[in-house]
Every structure is written in C-alpha cells, then in structure tokens.
C-alpha cells in the first residue's frame, strides 16, 4: 500500500492491517514520506485510536530499520523501558530498578532516551550518576557481556527516526511513536517489563508483546497514575507467559508499608531527581527504597527467578539496604 492510500484509509476511520502499518512506517524510516503526509497519518491514527495491528506493524518497521548488535548474547535479557509520559514527576524508578536487577545477576539491556515528561529521563539520570550513556555500539555490547548491564541510547540505535523528529516535535502530542519505542529494543530481549501512561494501553501492549513472541512480559499502570508499580495505590498489570495472557492487580498493602513520605519519590527538578536517586542507592530513602525494590521485584518475577512479586520485592530491598546495589553501581561506573 502506498503511503497516501494508508492515510486515506485512516481518514475513513478504518484501521490498517499489520502489513499496511509496517509498510507505511518503513517508508517513513527511509525518508520517503513528506512531513505533511506523516503528520496526517499520526493525527488520523491518534483520533481513531491505535490498534494492536497498527502498533505491531509500526514496531516491526522500527525494529527492522534499527542497528543490530554484532554480538550473539548467550543469556536471557531483560528490559525495563517504559513509555514515560505519565506526567507524575517521580524519580527514575525503572532505571534504578534496572540497576538493582543487574546487581542481582540479571542481564539488563536498558533501552531509553532523554526525558519525556519527568525532570530526567533514563539517559539523563544515568549520566548524572556517572554512567556514560552515549558510547559506541561495540562498547554497549561489551558492557552487557562483561558487566551485566548496558544502556541503549535510542537515538543512536534508531538513526532512521530522524526522519520523524521534526513532525513529532511540531505536533506536540502523543503519537504511535511514544508506544513503539519501548517495544523496539534492538537487542530483542525475551523478557520485558513495561510501565504505560494510560491503563487502556496495558491490553494493547501485552498483545503486541505476545505477537512479538516474548517468553514472559508484564505491562503495568498504577491507580494513582504511575507508569510503574506504586507503593501507594493498587497497580493493575497484564502478564504474558508462554503465549498466554492473564490480568492481575497488586496491592502494596501486602508489603506492610506505612507512613511513607511521597516527597521521597517525587522530584521537583533535575537536580532534585539526582539527589533522590543517590539517596536510594545509599539506602537513605525509605519510600524510594520500597518503590525501587517493588519494581525490581516485578522484574525478578518476570524473569522467573521467584514465584511472586512480593518475594522479589524482599530480595531487591535487601540488595539495596545491604549496599550490594551501591557497590555494584560504583564498580560499574569506575570502569567507565
């Protein structure tokens, strides 16, 4: 299907098939679609509501046009990249939980970018903490093999996205591009935990992950609006295991937490976000420790290392409080 025909179909309030969406996005990635046509495509799709097939097709195109690793990794990989954009301004919980997971021996290929809606994105906070995020492809792959953690800076691994950049910036609203980024890790991890900015996206994302063939994956959104597991409110999540999707809720009351200070997990500026992140790594933040441990625990659950998220939380919390995670991260950045 030609790009113009795809836009006309969307304008008629019809959804594209996976192949049609993939074809259009392939043209975009090659710089063959005008800004006017791309703007029309993104706007019409947003008005219709992105379907599973459309998100899957766009994801396949982005993956196809990404740089590919030269290394064949002989181990299971996890990514904790979320959509961002929940507008809550929390500390970088998914990034910190990725560090905790790596300190526990999980191989983490963290896919990410600069800030979407928070004061600091995953790239921003890692840089502030001393980890170099913009390195060569060879270094990124070597870090994963030798250290168990690596960061894939999205603009470097998805150079074809430059063709969509000006239109995305000009439109200024969320489009399908905000969805396909977390689904397009170039290392193709078979295990993934994704926090989403709207509860309606949990079903869509888990079905896309199912179509992509992941072994185990979890998509979550908390009832207080976070794109991660919350220590203050119930978190709903969809779960994929061996091709089967199930739906669940996690109530943090089961952890027995009380008198938590929300100010320890909500940042007012980039500098404040860094201060709060360091407090977590230094075991100086009660609420921050619980929040990061809970999300790391969910990662352990996705990896199949424990039977329940609660068990994972206890293991992750001990890693933080014992200084294990701090030592791991200090060793990690000392080799930069």
Swiss-Prot record:
GO cellular component terms, A-Z: cytosol
This protein's UniProt keywords: Amino-acid biosynthesis, Aromatic amino acid biosynthesis, Glycosyltransferase, Magnesium, Metal-binding, Transferase, Tryptophan biosynthesis
Top-rank lineage group of the source organism: Bacteria
Reactions performed catalytically: N-(5-phospho-beta-D-ribosyl)anthranilate + diphosphate = 5-phospho-alpha-D-ribose 1-diphosphate + anthranilate
Residues engaged in binding anthranilate 2: 168
Pathway per the UniProt entry: Amino-acid biosynthesis; L-tryptophan biosynthesis; L-tryptophan from chorismate: step 2/5
Binding site for Mg(2+) 2: 227-228
Homology family: Belongs to the anthranilate phosphoribosyltransferase family.
Subunit relationships: Homodimer.
Function summary: Catalyzes the transfer of the phosphoribosyl group of 5-phosphorylribose-1-pyrophosphate (PRPP) to anthranilate to yield N-(5'-phosphoribosyl)-anthranilate (PRA).
Protein name according to UniProt: Anthranilate phosphoribosyltransferase
Species whose genome carries this gene: Leptospira interrogans serogroup Icterohaemorrhagiae serovar Lai (strain 56601)
